[in-house]
Amino acid sequence: MRSLARICCLALAILVVGSAVAPRDAGPAAAPGWVSRAIPEARGEIKVGPDGKRTAVRYKGWTTHDFGAFRTYAYDDARPEPAPQLGTPPTGAVGDPKQGRALFLDRQKGPCTGCHLVPGDDVWPAGSVGPDLSTFGDRRLPDALIYQQLWDPRLTYPATVMPPWGAQKIFTAAEIVDLVAYLKTLHGPVPPERDADRNPFTRQRSAGFGDNLDPTNNPAVVRAEDAAALWKAPGPKGKSCADCHAGTPQQAMRGVATRYPRVVAEHGRVMGLEDFLSVHAEATTGRALPSESDANVDVTVMIKMASNGLPLAIDTTSSAARAAIERGKTSFYRRVGERNHACADCHTADRGANKFLGGRFLANIADGLTRHFPTWRTSQNEVWDMRKRMQWCMTPLGANMLAADSVEYAELELYLTTFDVGKPINTPGIRH
């Protein structure tokens, strides 16, 4: 019986990609009081209408759906990860393979093709985070095993990167029966690929977008150059940045960006450069530079460009920095949102890193994720800093975002930056 149990556990595991078990959540960290200085759409606020309807305030074009039922990265969100759940297939239910395939490709639900390759020219772009399921039916697994793996794979594979689709009510019981029916139709031989790029296991990674420091190629460079005028312009208090920082921005700010994020004793918290600008500029010049405002981001790029080529040298040894880094690491491995995902699921080598999530190639934290931020996003025609990128990640996870200048995001950014220590700053980047 023990051998049979081990075989069943192995069979259940074949649908997903796993990894080492993530560290347990650390106890709640005492975050200092902080009133967000971000623009309204970047504060992570929820509005409640007269009818009680909750609407999330986010950037233009982003969903306004409230994901308040699911836990977040907030340090005061003490909700535990939902417990693994046993799924019970509906008695006598017969699945519809055609409907199951439609669900497998449904972008509002998954799509499952974001991680798994299956046959069909309409499957584009497929991902490689999970195994190729093109011949899954040849494995002849029992329906109950497949159903449980779709309902909640954590019962047998705690470190899975696959969401608990049924337990989190993303797919209904009837829909999972249809998915099981579809998966059982997938048999070999697999027809030859007509396009090698359809298959994420043979697809070539993008070569990039050219010289990121060429102003004719990267609009973020032009915006940073324009920010020099703001540097010299007096604010409401009659002072400008240039009055205290002698020389050009390139001269005065050389080396500054190499030290951020850092613990700022005056404010009792970790601050990224954008966070510091939001308080320092107003305090000294009277000019507000709220987080995620164009002015804040552009000045940040200008200051970081002054340190291009210099190695990042953040504090990783002081007791305050070490504690903050540990909290950031805990956040990195914390599962959040409707899909119960962690940053680590996409950005560590034993999980999703260096693989395709749909058409997106997932970066590896070990290679460094921070030194090209802020970056020009060709898909958005905007300059994004690291915090907006973090907020954007929350939407597909089904989690409410925090304020862009929250201490939680700052300490997560600090942890990420430890992997870039010693590597040269190269800002602004270009990414899709």
Residues covered by each model-derived region:
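Gly/Gly-Pro-rich "capping" loops immediately C-terminal to redox-active cysteine motifs
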Residues: 113, 117-151, 161, 167, ...
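Glycine-rich, acidic and aromatic/proline-enriched surface loops and short helix-turn segments
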Residues: 106-109, 118, 152-156, 182, ...
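Sequence/structural segment immediately N-terminal to covalent heme-attachment motifs in c-type
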Residues: 70-84, 92-119, 200-208, 215-247, ...
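Bacterial N-terminal signal peptides that target proteins for export
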Residues: 1-9
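Post-cleavage N-terminal segment of exported redox proteins
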Residues: 10-97, 149, 180-223, 261-326, ...
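Short sequence/structural segments immediately N-terminal
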Residues: 32-35, 40-42, 48, 63, ...
